[in-house]
């Protein structure tokens, strides 16, 4: 596959055009996608039918997400926000309390983001360079917290995204010349009552009309799809293997590593691996620090959140039952132990887990221990 050009016409003798005309571009894409399946068959992956089945499903989800982003909404001259992760597309320990939006941009251009604040508990805007479909990482190049937004009386806002700060003092999201994406994170404590922010983006320093599809663009998009599926699945499998080395613990995750993978710089992450027998439970005790938000969640080997549509697989400051002293005890088990704050493993006896402190200045480590199901105390 070849690099993209900006031309809308092409020399019929060009090799990229020839690959499109004779079908090689599709055949090479399918062959490369097939090779991405090696991550599911790796010796390090648990020899468990559920993990394997979820692995194959995971690759279809990554492929679907990548096709949507790189094929349908990939033009930085005419960007739009799309759901990067949702209830059936998951990756990288996606947060069940979050709604993630992403739009492609080019750091050398200038954009306006318009929206209404809504009542969502936490809202953040990040500019990022690279991408799982480009470099295999997402480096933060700028960040704007909704707490710093200037709003009008109706809760509306405008943000300028650019390399240079606007001279009129407008809300500004800093970009770098290498910035390639803007991500919006919305975090809810109460999923039923909080109103999500509404956001849209447009280029303001030139035409904002989508370019026509070309052989070069289709070639580049398919290449990026394969790279995302391959790189993201391999990277997060490596994370899971690291967590497995010290099971049933929740140490703080390297902040630099989290940010390089696209994590929010305002969040302290505690990642771990749970490993249980059928008659065991994992007890997680926390004393949340003063912070904007906290939660605890379960995920599978592939760092996909478990199915939060139908099972209680996560708790936050609004849904967890607290003790009188403010501490919280949560219990991870495959069957209900009959105590508050049970998190359902959805049939898994092992998997990954994460605690987040958002906007904290102190970082207490969660305390974790394994007990027999019949010995769980509230």
Language model: regions and residue ranges:
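A compositional/structural signature for long, glycine/proline-rich flexible linkers
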Residues: 2-378
């Amino acid at each position: 596959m070849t690099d993209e050009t900006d031309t809308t016409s092409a020399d019929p003798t060009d090799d990229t055009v020839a690959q499109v005309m004779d079908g090689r571009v599709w055949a090479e894409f399918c062959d490369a996608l097939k090779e991405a399946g090696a991550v599911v068959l790796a010796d390090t992956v648990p020899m468990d039918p559920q993990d394997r089945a979820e692995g194959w499903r995971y690759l279809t989800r990554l492929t679907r997400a990548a096709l949507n982003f790189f094929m349908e909404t990939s033009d930085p001259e005419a960007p739009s926000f799309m759901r990067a992760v949702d209830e059936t597309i998951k990756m990288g320990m996606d947060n069940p309390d979050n709604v993630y939006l992403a739009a492609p941009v080019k750091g050398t251009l200038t954009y306006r983001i318009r929206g209404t604040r809504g009542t969502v508990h936490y809202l953040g805007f990040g500019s990022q360079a690279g991408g799982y479909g480009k470099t295999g990482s997402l480096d933060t190049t700028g960040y704007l917290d909704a707490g710093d937004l200037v709003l009008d009386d109706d809760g509306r806002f405008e943000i300028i995204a650019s390399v240079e700060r606007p001279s009129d003092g407008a809300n500004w999201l800093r970009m770098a010349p290498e910035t390639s994406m803007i991500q919006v994170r919305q975090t809810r404590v109460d999923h039923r009552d909080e109103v999500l922010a509404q956001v849209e983006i447009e280029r303001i320093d030139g035409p904002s009309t989508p370019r026509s599809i070309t052989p070069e663009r289709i070639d580049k998009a398919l290449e990026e799809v394969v790279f995302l599926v391959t790189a993201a699945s391999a990277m997060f499998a490596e994370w899971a293997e690291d967590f497995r080395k010290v099971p049933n613990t929740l140490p703080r995750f390297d902040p630099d590593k989290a940010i390089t993978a696209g994590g929010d710089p305002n969040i302290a992450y505690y990642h771990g691996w749970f490993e249980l027998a059928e008659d065991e439970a994992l007890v997680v005790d926390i004393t949340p620090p003063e912070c904007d938000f906290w939660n605890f969640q379960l995920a599978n080997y592939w760092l996909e959140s478990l199915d939060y549509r139908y099972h209680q697989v996560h708790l936050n400051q609004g849904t967890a039952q607290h003790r009188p002293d403010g501490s919280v005890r949560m219990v991870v088990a495959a069957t209900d132990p009959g105590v508050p704050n049970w998190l359902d493993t959805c049939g898994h006896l092992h998997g990954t887990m994460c605690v987040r402190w958002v906007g904290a200045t102190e970082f207490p480590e969660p305390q974790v221990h394994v007990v027999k199901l019949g010995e769980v105390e509230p």
